[in-house]
Amino acid sequence: MADILRFWKAKGIKGFRFDVINVISKPEVYEDDFEGDGRRFYTDGRNVHKYLKELVAAGGIDGMITVGEMSSTTLENCIGYTAEGNHELTMCFNFHHLKVDYKDGQKWELREPDYLAMKKLFQTWQEGMQAHGGWNALFWCNHDQPRAVSRFGSDTTYWKESAEMLAAAIHFMRGTPYIYQGEELGMTNPHFTRIEQYRDVESRNYYKILRQQDKTEAETLDIIAQRSRDDSRTPMQWDASENAGFTTGTPWIGIADNYKAINAAAQMDAPDSIRSFYKTLVALRKKMPVISAGKIEFLYPDNADLLAYRRYDGETELLVLCNLREREIAKPLPVGWTDAEKLLGNYPDTADTLRPYECVVLKK
């Protein structure tokens, strides 16, 4: 692995992502496991920290950007992986917040997202990393996850509002935000209706398993449509031409039917587009140290409808309010925030409530 790192470093590569890197330390003695899938034996093994230090030193990548994808990890281990003086990784991906809609922890069982659980996870990881010098990689989407706007928002009625709210929710947090291809356009799940449209081997296998569990064809396809890794693996939607401008040939998988409306060309010069909103988020993070380096405090932990937190650094304070629901909710303001300046929002005007999927960022 060190040879691979040196090879790409010599070509000018500035950073590396390590896939499920916390499973590289395996036990020397194999034990029987009568619970679960055995992951407790191979996840965050006792030599992972040692191996990472050796890899960073041998690969000559200390000081470069490195992000580790962590499987079933813990906060304590990720603090150790990312603490600056440990010379292991710059930041970690963890997936706990993306399991809040798993019924009984099972990916292929549907349920509504548990937003209180999600908020608690955000708070635990944000405050834990802050207290002990660790660093989070912030994300909703990747190549294995459904599209966030279809999963935690509305990809129809409130498509734009929910896509922008989800973006703001993590881009103002402490850590490094990641934007998955097409997320900045609000790309949705493709909503395939036939199993033949899928290429993902996991989805095809679970189609058979679910049918064997006596689920109907319609029930099975609904589950697959909401959970498949193919939801995020359809071609990038560049424009409204055939195949969304991705290729003049035949793509390996189909394209979402909404590509003529949701594509890069349609948003390139549109000042009120989702892409424009993302550009504003990136610009604010570059401009305002409180976003990239300030502290974070979470508010209203028992409110299942509202994600709210404060960022502060001694000079500037921000209040981030995100309505997680497809309905109007109350807009609570802490003492001293009534006359604060509106820095950003995904509605053109202001209101005394938070409208469906509304986000508001206040500054003082």
Which residues does each PLM region occupy?
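Active-site and adjacent substrate-binding regions of carbohydrate-active enzymes
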Residues: M1-G336, E341-K364
